[in-house]
Amino acid sequence: MAPKEWYKAYLIAPEEVEIEGLESFEKQTCRNRAIIGNGIMLSVPVKKVEHKQLTRDIEISYQSHWQHQHWIALVSTYKHTPFFDYYAEFFKPFYEKETRFLWDLNNEIHETIMMLLKNLSPTLSPREGEKFAYRCTADWRGEELNRFFGDGKSILDDLFEFGPETTDHLR
């Protein structure tokens, strides 16, 4: 799940935001990590990454029970927010099924978030044209990025707190 500020980029982008999948996978980025409201970092484990392996080819590892752990963390963090009960049903399926590629999981989550934000229209075509995945080319530890991306917390913070007004809140 990309940080909420990533979705702000959609709101301020003049025409469209390009999402790239043909880049080399970089570890320790938003491609497989998210920080949720209580400061917990959720990380989707991936199978061994080869040197310069493309982002779209990264496979998810299911050796641990990460899906169950992530869902429990999401529930305990957001269960008292105003819109959790309404939006939880859209996200629970991601924690019940196994998706082979991280690329596909990110795309499905992204499409769901875009659909829920309503004012942002998804123009996504996974694996067609190869222009779809999280583009995180900046150094996520850098001060410069923190000035734009703030605390890097997940879009779920705002979605569960503000519901249908999330888009207005992001602006």
For each of these PLM feature ranges, what is it?
Residues 1-123, 131-171:
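Residues lining hydrophobic/aromatic ligand-binding pockets adjacent to catalytic sites
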